[in-house]
């Protein structure tokens, strides 16, 4: 299992990959950095005329990083042939709509460390885009059209001024494996984030988050969750944090959390849990300082005691889900599919959408759907 440092290192190769990556024949031009003389890129009105032969070549990788560019004019380039574009570390204030709309084969775009306040709506035309880095700009929002970049695997929007993310981002970007939005002004994450079922890393530290989505258990591949340093804004964690079956690292340090959810005792794969800098009451400091295993045992025992004391109607949500996931077992309880209906949306609450039964709020990944026969959700048409 990869640790956060390893995964972070893996991600850092994206920028380097844009310069020297050679795979499946995508790069068929010499790997040398483009200069003002080899590309007609205009910087503050100063332009250099390229040779006619250079104008007609089909460039696959275009690196214009660190050239102090303030604007772009790439009329001499066959933009449709570009697969990787690096415009990082410049002074670019605006990306032309027409420029982006022409780069239909682009799969890696690096715009970090510029002066961007907005991204063009035409970014939604980049249907093959897999890596997008817009960190270190002045973005206050991401265009809704980014939801059309359905091939996107990594989105880095760190160090901006984002106050919100597109509402449906989680419903559309189903291939996203890393979402990094640290050092922004986010007050909340949209509920749709809970349906990024391919997500492995979620980094939302250094924001102003006051809460997290309730249905985090849908993130079955999530390995790293970092919501540290939201300070006094984040005071509670949802119970579903303890239902993240693949979670390896959880960092909730330096927040205003007083009580950790008992469900943390069910995190079987957890290897690193950071809770320092919180005014914790439960678990007490004496338990926390004993380390991860002691904390997990304490939370697990506390959850069991709470379950025994709680009236039946109030037990169903948490324990019902834990049993379904195989994270908990109780005497006299079956873990089979026929085991009651506690903790799940009633079938009557579902409606047909293109032949698939979904709840009214479009739950794309409900545990009941996973563990029930397909026939329960794929019904023959009614006439």
Swiss-Prot record:
Stretches forming LRR repeats: 56-79, 80-102, 104-126, 127-149, 151-173, 174-197, 199-219, 221-244, 245-268, 270-290
Pfam families, per database record: LRR_1, LRR_8
Recorded family membership: Belongs to the SHOC2 family.
InterPro entries listed in its UniProt record: Leu-rich_rpt, Leu-rich_rpt_typical-subtyp, LRR_dom_sf, LRR_domain-containing
Expression sites by tissue: Widely expressed except flowers.
Protein name listed in UniProt: Plant intracellular Ras-group-related LRR protein 8
GO cellular component: mitochondrion
Keywords in alphabetical order: Leucine-rich repeat, Repeat
Protein source organism: Arabidopsis thaliana
